[in-house]
């Protein structure tokens, strides 16, 4: 891309400094060396993996002591638990024996499922947002925030009407930080989700398409206008706030560091042949892959979209005309643009018309010799039913779309392969 760098100690930098005006074709990435994962035995991933998180390095650069940084995590986690009913905890991950049998895998292979459905706000999304909140709060604690008091805080902003909005509003409520949530017209948004957003004190802004809007999601347009006006991008899109790519890696670290089922905790670790990860905006897949890569593991990554909206798969194919997936970022406009028209799917949480974090996802698939998978709707529906029937996990069709990708290409896999998926969000 443009080659700009940002020092880890620079406060409140969310985007590439060269992403000015309407030029959104920029993306920051976290630069960190591969290192053996040696988490502590704390059951909170933001404490267990704290020394690997970029926010911790940032807070240390501001002069906060190790004890102060740990205290910030514990305090915020307690506040989140008071609102959500749970704080951040390492989530279950293991072989789904009945599901593996149903899909014809041998005892040596099978499907391992990471269950995020009982996490904060019922999905993985809060993991991404928590490191943004940690960045904000540590900036305040260090006396580096440009606002003088909590009452003068700028509002948070997010464009979402689903799990990300719920996660963002939950974290905002925990610290009494004002938040604006940009949602599609009420006919397109879940009444239950909207009701919960209001309960959490969010300022919900409906965003019908305006005649002057360019292509793309009107909610994202209004969100960006709010950020231009001074709001903090409390977003799960790395192109809007790169700090969301920090906390999301904890999922990959938990999976990459998991011990074999027949070993004592801490003895060895599982190795996987493939990861199937559902993709909407792309940060989730980028983070899971980054977590594995930093741990020194590169199973084949398959980013899964539906045939109703598959801009990432299109970008993958287009990339081979401009030098391949790892060079595609220099040809943004030729590879990634809004998908039109966006169809319908039960997996409505991955119908983003753009895969905003497409560059790291393409690179991760290329590095691991993976490829995108476009799932048909019958596989989307089958996946949700299969997972619930064979594991009891009550995930939404969005949350089981990775399994739908596996179903789509099951006949191409050997029966002894080890496959990992993430049940990323609860059925509502």
Stretch-by-stretch model annotation:
Residues 142-184, 268-284, 301, 419-423:
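A short, small-residue-rich loop immediately preceding and capping a beta-strand
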Residues 221-295, 381-387:
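Active-site/ligand-binding-proximal alpha/beta "capping" segment
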Residues 404-428:
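Catalytic phosphate/nucleotide-handling subdomain of diverse soluble enzymes
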Residues 209, 213-233, 238, 294-395:
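Active-site/ligand-binding loops adjacent to catalytic centers
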């Amino acid at each position: 891309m443009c080659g700009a760098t940002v020092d880890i100690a620079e406060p409140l930098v969310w985007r590439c400094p060269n992403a000015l005006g309407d030029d959104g074709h920029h993306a920051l990435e976290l630069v960190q060396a591969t290192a053996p994962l040696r988490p502590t035995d704390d059951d909170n991933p933001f404490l267990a993996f704290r020394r690997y998180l970029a926010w911790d390095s940032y807070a240390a650069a501001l002069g906060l002591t190790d004890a102060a940084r740990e205290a910030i995590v514990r305090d915020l986690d307690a506040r989140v638990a008071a609102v959500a009913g749970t704080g951040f905890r390492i989530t279950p991950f293991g072989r789904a024996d009945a599901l593996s049998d149903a899909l014809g895998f041998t005892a040596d292979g099978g499907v391992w499922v990471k269950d995020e459905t009982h996490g904060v706000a019922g999905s993985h999304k809060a993991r991404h947002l928590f490191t943004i909140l940690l960045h904000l709060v540590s900036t305040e604690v260090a006396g580096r925030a440009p606002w003088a008091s909590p009452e003068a805080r700028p509002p948070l902003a997010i464009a979402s009407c689903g799990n990300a909005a719920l996660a963002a509003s939950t974290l905002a409520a925990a610290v009494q930080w004002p938040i604006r949530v940009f949602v599609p017209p009420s006919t397109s948004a879940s009444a239950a989700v909207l009701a919960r957003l209001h309960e959490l004190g969010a300022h919900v802004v409906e965003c019908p398409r305006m005649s002057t809007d360019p292509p793309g999601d009107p909610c994202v347009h209004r969100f960006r206008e709010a950020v231009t006006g001074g709001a903090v991008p409390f977003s799960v899109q790395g192109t809007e706030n790169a700090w969301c790519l920090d906390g999301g890696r904890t999922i990959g670290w938990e999976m990459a560091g998991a011990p074999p089922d027949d070993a004592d905790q801490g003895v060895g670790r599982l190795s996987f042949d493939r990861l199937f990860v559902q993709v909407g905006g792309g940060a989730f897949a980028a983070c899971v892959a980054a977590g594995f890569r930093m741990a020194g593991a590169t199973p084949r990554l398959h980013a899964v979209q539906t045939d109703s909206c598959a801009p990432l798969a299109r970008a993958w194919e287009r990339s081979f005309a401009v030098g391949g997936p790892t060079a595609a970022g220099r040809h943004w406009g030729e590879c990634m643009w809004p998908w039109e028209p966006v169809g319908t799917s039960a997996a409505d949480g991955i119908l983003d018309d753009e895969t905003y974090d497409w560059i790291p996802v393409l690179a991760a698939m290329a590095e691991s010799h993976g490829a995108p998978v476009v799932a048909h709707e019958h596989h989307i529906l089958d996946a949700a039913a299969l997972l619930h029937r064979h594991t009891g996990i009550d995930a939404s069709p969005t949350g089981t779309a990775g399994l739908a990708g596996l179903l789509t290409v099951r006949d191409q896999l050997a029966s002894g392969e080890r496959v990992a998926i993430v049940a990323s969000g609860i059925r509502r």
